[in-house]
Amino acid sequence: MMKEIPGPPTEAQIEDGRLLFAGECEFFFGSQKIDQLPPVGRPEVAFAGRSNVGKSSIINALTGRRALARASSEPGRTKQLNFFNLADRLSLVDMPGYGFAKAAKSVKEDWQDMMFAYLRGRTTLERVILLLDARIELKASDKDVMELLDRAAVVFQIVLTKCDQVKPKALAAKIAEVEALALKHAAAYPRIIATSSETGFGIEDLRAEIARFAVPLQTSGEGQSGS
């Protein structure tokens, strides 16, 4: 059965996203091993992408903070899951970048094992935002991660980055290409979001999408720890 591609967010959903991301957002936990994860609590939305895809820039643009998620000086250097508390209503999880060519095979395998264990076993994980660079062709590592997400049975949504650097006709073609690819993956949410952390294009749309998973305001203080 063909997936139906959802429409853009409503004005009310955009406002929900604005309110959520206007709240405080603070780093509260970093984990290099799967047995060091923080206790489950708030719903989680994780961000995945190749090294240099602009993941840190997107997280900073979403939260309106310049240095919340710091980009590593060497692609793929930071191999840990970083957890951020967003307004006590949602946790944002910055996953280590993948596709780092200089890394040893054993390092890549360790990354995949840790990511699969996190994805498969994290009951509070609501969605993975998979970031792809709109300027370049999909890499084998991107397709590998999509297959990993399918196997882990975790819903993922493709978000294109650096779209301000792509001409409109080429961007439309890229969106169509990625939409077709998403329809082939069981775990893929079929709606693609095009963004630019530089211009803010698509950021309110992505905020609205993520806000769907946050604890509702009236119950945000119930059963949640401060971390």
UniProtKB/Swiss-Prot annotation:
It comes from the Bacteria. One of its GO terms (molecular function) is metal ion binding. Residues 41-216 form the EngB-type G domain. GO terms for biological process: division septum assembly. InterPro entries: G_ENGB_dom, GTP-bd, GTP-bd_ribosome_bio_YsxC, P-loop_NTPase. Keywords: Cell cycle, Cell division, GTP-binding, Magnesium, Metal-binding, Nucleotide-binding, Septation. GTP binds at residues 49-56, 76-80, 94-97, 161-164, 195-197. Its cofactor is Mg(2+). One of its GO terms (cellular component) is cytosol. SUPFAM superfamilies: P-loop containing nucleoside triphosphate hydrolases. HAMAP family: GTPase_EngB. Belongs to the TRAFAC class TrmE-Era-EngA-EngB-Septin-like GTPase superfamily. EngB GTPase family. This is Probable GTP-binding protein EngB. The gene is engB.
